[in-house]
Amino acid sequence: MTKENLLQHLQECCDRLFGCSLEMATEKQVYRAVCVAVRELLEDDRRAFVEQTRAEQRKQVYYMSMEFLVGTSLRNNLYNMGLLEPAGEILHDLGFSLESLCALEPDAGLGNGGLGRLASCYMDAATGLNYPVTGFSIRYEFGIFRQKIVDGWQMEFPDNWLEMGDVWLHTRKDDAVEVRFGGQVHEWMDGDKFKTAQTGYQSVIAVPHDLYISGYGSKAVNKLTLWSASMPQSFDMNAFSRGDYVRALEQNTMAEAISKVLYPADNHINGKRLRLRQQYLLVSSSLQSILNEHLKNYHTLDNLADKVAVHINDTHPALCVPELMRLLVDEHDYSWERAWEITCATLSYTNHTVMAEALERWPVDLFREQLPRIYAICQEINRRLMEKLHCVYPNDPGKWEYMAAVTNSEVRMANLCLACCHKINGVSQLHTEILEKTIFRDYYNLDHSRFLNITNGIAYRRWLCQSNPALTGYLQSLIGDGFLNDANALEALLQYRDDPDVLENLQAIKRKNKVRLAAYIAKHNGVNVDPDSIFDVQVKRLHEYKRQLLNVLHILTLYNDIKDHPEKPVYPQTFIFAAKASAGYYLAKQIISLIVAVSNLVNSDPQVQNKLKVVFIEDYKVSLAEIIIPAADLSEQISVAGKEASGTSNMKLMINGAVTLGTLDGANVEIRERVDDENMFLFGMTADEVQALWQRGYDPRQFLTPELDRVLQMLTSGVLGQRFDDVAASLLTPRFGAADSYMTVADFASYKAAKAHAVEVYQDRTRFAKMSLTNIARAGIFSSDRSVEQYAREIWDL
C-alpha cells in the first residue's frame, strides 16, 4: 500500500468514526482511526486468506489456551505489514507522533506469564509461515490485574484494557453459542441408541470477539477468537416489577463473572468454581464453533481429524477431551468407539510443567455439580481406561491409581489428555526427558510413539527487531537483511567476534538502551541508576521455584560486605526485578515485599548507593519487557534444576545480547549447547543432583553459611523495616511443606561464586562484549518459526 492510499484510508476512517478530518481530530481520535484502518486492512487480507484455504481444503489448526499475552498490536501490525515508515511519516505531517500514539494503547489483558506469551509468539510465527491457525481464549474484561506496590505490598486493581484496546476486536453476536452448566442428566435407551438429556441447567451465552493476527511479510491473517459470557436474557422484568431490583440483575452478573478476570484467586471454593466455569466456557464454545465451521465446509464430521487439529496448551483446556466426546456422541449421534477414535486423532497436548500442583485436579463434587454430563463422560473414559490397564499391567494397582483420570474423589486433567491425545510434547529437552522418566513415565512406557519434544521459541522480530531497532539496524549493516526472514542467519555475526570496532559499537548500543531504561526507572521509581553499572535483570512471574528469593538474599550479602568493608572497591551493579504474584499466593507476595524492602534499604544508604541499586518495576507486561530486555547485561535464569519446563525470557534476553547466569534447567541446557560454558555463567546442582539430594534427605541447615545465616536473621530482626518470618521459615523449617522446597540454601554458595565471576568478567569489556555477540549470533535456533514448523510437521500434520 502506498503512503497516499494509506492516508486516504485513514481520512475515511476518521470521518466515518468521528465526523471530522484527521487535521481536526484529537490524539485519541487519531489513535482510534489508525487502529481501525489497520484492522480493516487485516480484515480484507483475512477474507482472502480464508477463501484461499477453503478452496485448497487446507487442514485447520485450533490452538486452545487460557491466555494469550499479546502485548500491544499497533506497532506490531504496522511492522509486519511494512507500513511502519509511511504511517510514521503521515502522522508526523499531521503533527502527531507514532510513538505517542503507540503509548496510548494498553497491553491486551489476555494473559499473565510465559504460557500466554508463548501462545502469542506461536500465533505470530504461524501467520508469518502461512499456516491457518486460530487461537481460542476468553475476552477477559479486566485482564489478570494491574499491579501497584502500596507500602511495599502488591495490590491488585482492575486492568480496564478494553477502554482503549477494544478497537482491535470484531464482535460477532450472530455467531454466539450456548454453554450449559449444572442441572441434572437423564439417560435412557432409544432402541439400540443411548440417549441423554440435561435439564434444570443454567444457560450462558458465549459471544465471539475476533482479534486479527498479522505475520511478518505475509498476506496470511489469522485470528484469536475470544469469548465473553452473558445470560440469554439479561434482565428479569418480573423480579424488577416486584421491586426485587438486585435479583433482576443477579443472574446476568453471575454469568458475566466468567469472563471478568484471568485466573481468579482459587484459594476458596467460589474461586475454584469460577475457574472451572471459565475453562468449560472456553472449551465448549470453541469446539461448538469448530464443528459448526467444519460442517459448513464438509457436511460431515467423519473427516474431522483429517481436516482439523485441536491443540491443548497446558491442562486448562483439557476439558476438550470429554466435551468433544459429548458433542460427537450426544449431538451428532456417533458411537462411543467412533467418537473416541476421532477425538484421539484430533487432539494433541503440550505439557508446560513438571510441578504436581500445576497438573490440575478438580474435586469430584464440584465437577459433577457444574458439569454433570461431562463428569459422566469422564467416568466412562476412566472405566474403559481401567479395563485396558488391567490387561496391560495386571496385578499392579499402583499403576492403575497413578494413571487414572478419575480417582480419589478428583478428576485429573493431565491424565485425561494422556489417555486420549495422539501427540504429547514437552517444551525443552530436559523437560521432556523428565516427563518421560518420571511423572508421565507409565503413559510413556505404554506408547513411546505419542511423546516428543519441541523446544519453545520466541517471536524474535518483536523481541529484537521491534524492541531493539538500534541493534537490528546495526546487524543489518553488518550481515544484511537475511536474518529478518531466517533467524539462523544471525550466525554470520560470529565473523566479527574479534573486531574491536564491532564490539565497541555493540557496547554503545547496549548503553543507549540502558540510558532509556534508566530514564524509565527515574520517572516511575524515583531512583537514579547508573547506565555504566551492570544491569542484572530478573523479569518473570513471581514463583518460589523461579527463586527471586535467591537473588535478593545474595543482594543482602553484598550489602553487608560493603558495610563491613567500605574501603573495598566494588564495581557498581543495578539489580532489576519485575514480576507479578498470583493474587492468592501469599508467600510470593511476601517475596515481592522483601525485594521492595531491600531496595529501600540499599537505595537510601549513602555508603552503598553508588555501588548497589535495587529496583522493583511494578506492573510487568509485554510493553515494559520491550524496554527492560534490550538493556540487560546479565540474564538471571536461576530456577532450581528440574522445575522450569523451558523458559522464554532466557531466549529474549539472549538475542538482545544479555549473558545468561543460570542453572542447567529448562532451555538453559540448550542455550549452553549453543554458546558453550565460556559464554554463560553456570551454577548450582543439576536436575539429577537435586533428585539425589532429596533422596538422601535434604536438610538446608547443613548448607547454611555464616553470611547466609546473618542475612536470614536480618529478615526476622526488623532491620528491613518489617519482619519476614514466613520467608525465613520457608527456608529452614517444614512449616510450609518440606523445608526449602526449591533448594535456595543448597545452591547459595555456588550462586554467590558465579555472580562474583560474572562481575569480574564484565570488567574486561572486550571479553564480555564477545560473550554478548556470541549469544546474539547463536540465538536463532530459539525462533518460534522453528518451533511452529516442528508442530506443523510432527503434530498437526500440515
Regions found by a protein language model. Name each.
Residues M1-L798:
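A conserved ligand/cofactor-binding region detector
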